[in-house]
Each structure stands twice: as C-alpha cells, then as structure tokens.
C-alpha cells in the first residue's frame, strides 16, 4: 500500500504564514516565532523553526490571518540546516478549518477521518 493511502488526511504542499509559540528545548525560555509551513493537512503541518523543540513537546500554532490558535504536539524534528529545522506538528484534534484554504481535499472532511492510526 502506498504511504499516501495510509495517511489520515492528504497533505498539501503550501507555504502559509504561521506563528508558533512554545517553550524552547534549548534554554526552557518561552518563544514566539513567525514562520511558514511546508506542508499542511487536517491533522497538522510540517513547518520550519529556528527555535529548538523536542519530540512530544506541546506547542501552539497560530494562524495570523484570523488569530485562530490550536495546540499541537511535535511529532518530528529534522536536522538543523542553516539555523532552521523541519518540524512536524500534529494537532491534538483534527482541525481542517484551521488552514482556511479554499479547496481542501475531500478526505479532510470525511466522517471518522481522524480515527485511523496514521
């Protein structure tokens, strides 16, 4: 089975502005970082971060276009490249409406879409 077939919701490759708030894994200080997405889905996003975070850490994602806030959990931290790392964030609950995009994939709105294991 293809990996995309196993996903809970389709990923969209898109650069959207985003604000991330949380606690820095480096010095335990609170951070607020303006950044952008690489991919989004109904279940989270892949973003670029300068601040250091840890797997499992809870952070807040803020959509600056409407000030909507969602809590998420860090599910992936890539290697640091030029001071930035790719960070995967999973919403605690699916939130397809968070992204405010015009043409969301059909599986973002299927009943039970958030129920599978991936």
Where are these regions (language model features)?
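Structured alpha-helical
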Residues: 1-118
